[in-house]
């Protein structure tokens, strides 16, 4: 069996611009891409916290340490400078790959600086603790 698992998450990054006439994609600060384990032309999903739009595109590197997060092409219609977004990518893994797979979680501040960077696994102690805390939310 294969499972689709979160590979990378950039949480609450601010859109810095939009270029409707660029051919497509999201331009993202190269250092943020590396922290999140994203490579150029990788498929990503974008969730716009401000307006609820959810869409997919691909990522291309922007200026390193510039804080760039620019919607390009048709995606430019789905967000504006100042909007807060969440960027995710997924991995398709078999059961063996899942055992040691590392998830990159990158948390941003208001200036598009990395506030926190976590690398975790599906079976980490932290994830087990969250599951344990939430089990009493399940109703019989």
Curated annotation (Swiss-Prot):
Record keywords, A-Z: Autocatalytic cleavage, Cytoplasm, Decarboxylase, Lyase, Pantothenate biosynthesis, Pyruvate, Schiff base, Zymogen
UniProt-annotated location(s): Cytoplasm
Assembly and oligomerization: Heterooctamer of four alpha and four beta subunits.
Origin: domain of life: Bacteria
EC number: 4.1.1.11
One Gene Ontology term, aspect cellular component: cytosol
Gene, per the UniProt record: panD
GO molecular function: aspartate 1-decarboxylase activity
Protein task: Catalyzes the pyruvoyl-dependent decarboxylation of aspartate to produce beta-alanine.
Membrane spanning residue stretches: none
Gene3D superfamilies membership: 2.40.40.20
Post-translational modification note: Is synthesized initially as an inactive proenzyme, which is activated by self-cleavage at a specific serine bond to produce a beta-subunit with a hydroxyl group at its C-terminus and an alpha-subunit with a pyruvoyl group at its N-terminus.
Organism classification: Bacteria, Pseudomonadati, Aquificota, Aquificia, Aquificales
The protein's annotated pathway: Cofactor biosynthesis; (R)-pantothenate biosynthesis; beta-alanine from L-aspartate: step 1/1
Native organism: Persephonella marina (strain DSM 14350 / EX-H1)
Cofactor note: Binds 1 pyruvoyl group covalently per subunit.
Cofactor: pyruvate
Protein name stated in the entry: Aspartate 1-decarboxylase
């Amino acid at each position: 069996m294969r499972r689709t698992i979160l590979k990378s998450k950039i949480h609450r990054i601010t859109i810095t611009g939009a270029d409707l006439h660029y051919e497509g994609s999201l331009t993202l600060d190269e250092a943020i891409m590396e922290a999140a384990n994203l490579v150029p032309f990788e498929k990503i999903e974008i969730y716009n916290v401000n307006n609820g739009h959810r869409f997919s595109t691909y990522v291309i590197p922007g200026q390193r340490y510039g804080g760039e997060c620019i919607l390009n092409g048709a995606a430019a219609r789905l967000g504006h400078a100042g909007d807060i977004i969440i960027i995710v990518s997924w991995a398709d893994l078999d059961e063996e790959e899942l055992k040691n797979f590392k998830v990159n979680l990158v948390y941003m501040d208001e200036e598009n600086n990395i506030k926190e960077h976590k690398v975790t696994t599906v079976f980490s102690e932290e994830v087990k603790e969250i599951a344990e805390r939430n089990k009493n939310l399940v109703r019989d």
